Amino acid sequence: MAAGWVLSECGLRPLPRIYSRPRIGFTSKTTNLLKLRELPDSKSYNLCSSFKVSSWSNSKQSNWALNVAVPVNVSTVSGEDDREREEFNGIVNVDEGKGEFFDAGAPPPFTLADIRAAIPKHCWVKNPWRSMSYVLRDVVVVFGLAAVAAYFNNWVAWPLYWFCQGTMFWALFVLGHDCGHGSFSNNPKLNSVVGHLLHSSILVPYHGWRISHRTHHQNHGHVENDESWHPLSEKIFKSLDNVTKTLRFSLPFPMLAYPFYLWSRSPGKKGSHFHPDSGLFVPKERKDIITSTACWTAMAALLVYLNFSMGPVQMLKLYGIPYWIFVMWLDFVTYLHHHGHEDKLPWYRGKAWSYLRGGLTTLDRDYGWINNIHHDIGTHVIHHLFPQIPHYHLVEATEAAKPVMGKYYREPKKSGPLPLHLLGSLVRSMKEDHYVSDTGDVVYYQKDPKLSGIGGEKTE
């Protein structure tokens, strides 16, 4: 059972709300930040008062007038220490440059149509020839890398080959992913053929994954209905044994979860991506699942044949290790597009959730030199909101949409040639993002202080 929990590439079920979010923030250009704190037993009442706050920059005082519903206990805090700021930023983010509060969980003041209108019309145009050129490029590189590695066949070249080839397997996956979204071309048959060839070659059931991924996009940010990398509820988290917790939140184990997720889905959810009668699918999709499973089986049979003809060691070097590098890329990228930001981001349920609010909790990431190799999958916010946009227009579409999204768009940290900075984000998230409350329509990750995130469970 422990294995099942670890091997979950998604999260689980509901993730509840931990802290109550203050809905109203207030600042002054001449004052330091103020902080609302709500006690569990607080009662709301109308406060209409005037008070003064001293400014560090000068001796002048600012008058404040409020006529809002606030918690019974209100504290004004100047010069918060780092620990308090870290806790507070999890709920209401602070724009340090302007000294303004920003509630990431508040409904946005714009609509999905507003974002769509800001994106140039040509960004929606799909060019199948251009899409196929990327397929040709990647396939040539894959076979070229394999030929060069087999030719030199020395232990200096193999590690470099494994990283490069695993990255290229990941690039093939992204192109197949575009086929699944229909952003590859307007021809469903072409999308299906190319998608099957690309995904089957790296042991991914095309239709099975396409359908579950569609569910992820349609329910992004929803604690119960999301399909990929959503959190554990507090009740489920506390029911796990120490070994399971260690495996679930200790690197590198979560980064190896994807193949197992394909077979058994997530804890708390039943179904396989290979079985036509799985709960993931509706009856009319049965034929598609059978087709994809047959293609996957054919690829597996080919690998077995090559294993006997070339030898298991050579196949391990040429295909096996690059495959697991690809899996790590997939889990690494998909996890960090929904986790690991410096500020805690909300998850929703019930009436608080909407397609727009859920999509705005996704994150863009900069991967340096890898951006072009894996087809700009790091431009994830616009991709999540409008998956029909081809990958080669995502950067332009994102730039056009930024002014509309404002603070709801979180500018990614600039990467060096390789995205090594993201390893820190991954480690921090594994240490801090453990579970969410069992109740509440807007919830945030909480941390189990006894769980280290890398070393496993810290017992008292």
UniProtKB/Swiss-Prot annotation:
Entry keyword annotation includes Oxidoreductase: yes
Entry's Gene Ontology BP terms: unsaturated fatty acid biosynthetic process
Gene assigned in the entry: FAD7A-1
Locus of motif Histidine box-3: 380-384
Topology with respect to the bilayer: Peripheral membrane protein
UniProt remark on domains: The histidine box domains may contain the active site and/or be involved in metal ion binding.
EC number assigned by the record: 1.14.19.-
Intervals of motif Histidine box-1: 177-181
A Pfam family assignment: FA_desaturase
GO molecular function: oxidoreductase activity, acting on paired donors, with oxidation of a pair of donors resulting in the reduction of molecular oxygen to two molecules of water
Protein name: Omega-3 fatty acid desaturase, chloroplastic
Similarity comment text for this entry: Belongs to the fatty acid desaturase type 1 family.
Entry GO CC: chloroplast membrane
Compartments where found: Plastid, Chloroplast membrane
Regions that span the bilayer: none
Source organism, top-level taxon: Eukaryota
Keywords, comma-separated and alphabetical: Chloroplast, Fatty acid biosynthesis, Fatty acid metabolism, Lipid biosynthesis, Lipid metabolism, Membrane, Oxidoreductase, Plastid, Transit peptide
Biological role: Chloroplast omega-3 fatty acid desaturase introduces the third double bond in the biosynthesis of 16:3 and 18:3 fatty acids, important constituents of plant membranes. It is thought to use ferredoxin as an electron donor and to act on fatty acids esterified to galactolipids, sulfolipids and phosphatidylglycerol.
Record pathway: Lipid metabolism; polyunsaturated fatty acid biosynthesis
